[in-house]
From Swiss-Prot:
The modification Phosphoserine is found at residues 64, 93. Residues 60-88 are annotated as: Disordered. It is found in: Virion membrane; Host apical cell membrane. Its main location: virion. Cytoplasmic tail plays an important role in virion assembly and morphogenesis. Forms a proton-selective ion channel that is necessary for the efficient release of the viral genome during virus entry. After attaching to the cell surface, the virion enters the cell by endocytosis. Acidification of the endosome triggers M2 ion channel activity. Residues 44-97 are intravirion. The record marks 41 as: Seems to be involved in pH gating. The M2 protein from most influenza A strains is inhibited by amantadine and rimantadine, resulting in viral uncoating incapacity. Emergence of amantadine-resistant variants is usually rapid. InterPro entries: Flu_M2. GO terms for molecular function: monoatomic ion channel activity; proton transmembrane transporter activity. It comes from Influenza A virus (strain A/Bangkok/1/1979 H3N2). Homotetramer; composed of two disulfide-linked dimers held together by non-covalent interactions. May interact with matrix protein 1. This is Matrix protein 2.
Length: 97
């Protein structure tokens, strides 16, 4: 149960919980949402690299190189790198006086 809805008090030398409205639908919904949030947070921290890489690049994975000779693969890599290098020339350095 949620710490916000329960009060723990010592009862007969043991810790017990006095909450009469634990069957309230709002309390149940809040507990479920809290548990789901905790699970998602833990998964996010464990797999954040995979998750954010997926969202950044999506399902795009470049063309398949299966059955392509290594020389053609290298040529394709060079073309792609040259295209990236050419894009760098579009940036203009502005100096303020």
């Amino acid at each position: 149960m949620s710490l916000l809805t329960e009060v723990e008090t010592p009862i007969r030398n043991e810790w017990g919980c006095r909450c009469n409205d634990s069957s309230d639908p709002l309390v149940v919904a809040a507990s479920i949402i809290g548990i789901l949030h905790l699970i998602l947070w833990i998964l996010d921290r464990l797999f954040f690299k995979c998750i954010y890489r997926f969202f950044k690049h999506g399902l795009k994975r470049g063309p398949s190189t299966e059955g392509v000779p290594e020389s053609m693969r290298e040529e394709y890599r060079k073309e792609q790198q040259n295209a990236v290098d050419a894009d760098d020339s579009h940036f203009v350095s502005i100096e303020l006086e």
